[in-house]
Every structure is written in C-alpha cells, then in structure tokens.
Amino acid sequence: MRFNSFAFTLAVTFCLGLVLFTPGCASKAPAFGQKGYTENGKASYYSDKLRGNKMANGQRYRPGKRTAAHKKLPFGTKVKVTNPVNGKSVKVRITDRGPFVAGRIIDLSKSAARKLDMQRAGVVPVQMKVIKPAKND
C-alpha cells in the first residue's frame, strides 16, 4: 500500500475546516433576565407586618398573591422557584426589590413561601429560573 501525501493533506485540511468553521457543541447560558436564566441561593419571605405597604413597582403587598422581590430582574418577570430539599416549586412575578442580605437571591410572598413549604424554616436554599421575561413596554 502506497502513501498518497496529496490525499492525506486534503483529508487533514477538510477535518481542520470542519473543526474551525462548525459552530461549537457547547450551549451558551441564557443572558440575565432571559428565559432559562437561573440563579442558585437562598430564599426568604415577607412578614405579615408588610401587608399593604407599597412595593418598588408601586403596588401594595398582598400576602395572598404569588409575588417576589429580586435585586435586579425587571418588574413583571415570571420565575419558577424550586426548593431542592423537598422538590416543591412555585411560579411568581417580580414586583419588588431585595433581598438585601448576603446569600439571599429572592424574597417571596407568604403564599409563595407556603407553596414551597418553607414557612417554618424561614430561609431555604432554592433554584430560581426565569420562565417568562418582562414585557418591554
């Protein structure tokens, strides 16, 4: 069997072209605030004493609504918050700013906290995932 250097060079060039000009297989993480964006940290929930107080979006806090506070996500963003300890999750709308305690990523309304079964603990580890970005009005 005779070695053909032209065929070898052509095959190597073809393979190198595939590697260089084919998009990578690694997926890019969703951008901040976009569908699929996730954060891991701790969640806490609002006290009943805050009932009726104005939130950062101008609305009044109502413990029965499934709302939440996040430091930077736009108001109106819908997120799914999951408690990995028990597997329970809840969908909430961002309506306020906070929490401003290190390690905490989201403050939940009482109704949302109840859904995650976190009322007794007060603060629990969670994963938060954007399921619907805020509308740009």
Model-derived regions: residue spans:
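Secreted/periplasmic proteins
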Residues: 2-12, 18-137
